[in-house]
Amino acid sequence: MDDFAIHVAVGNVYGLIGNEANALQPKKRPLSSMAPTIVLREGRPELVVGAAGGPRIISATLQTILNVLDFHMSVSSAVEAPRIHHQWIPDRLNFEAGISPQTRKGLEERDHTLREQSALGVAQAIARQGAQLSGAADSRKFDRARTE
């Protein structure tokens, strides 16, 4: 039910403030952060990523993609890497343990308000390298798929 604004101007379980445009009504679609993503290379699927976690879905999905494509991490390392998330209100940058002290210092020097938080989204991903597929299930969630 947190995809709808049950009470206008009151935060939901994720801290998002709802308004009348997203009020609960019959035949209305809820606001959603779902972002199942397929990355193509030369028209073929290269990476598939999805996540759970309300407004943290987009951050978890994007950071997993960047970790694989830009930072050349394995799919399992990309899924397990610590994450950051900002959602406008409240005006603070949440981060997971494991973010380097240098990164934290740099963010503080740029006047970000920081707060350590656990499990900023839960991602699942499959990467293709040639004919080889590699899958990763986020250990932030206890009931996960096996990736052996």
Give the role of each language-model region.
Residues A51-M73:
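Alpha-helical support elements that line or immediately flank enzyme active sites
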Residues M1-F4, R29-L31, P36-P45, A52-R56, ...:
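Short, glycine-/Ser/Thr-/acidic-enriched flexible segments
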Residues H7-A9, R56-L62, R144-E148:
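A short, polar/proline- and glycine-enriched secondary-structure boundary/capping micro-motif
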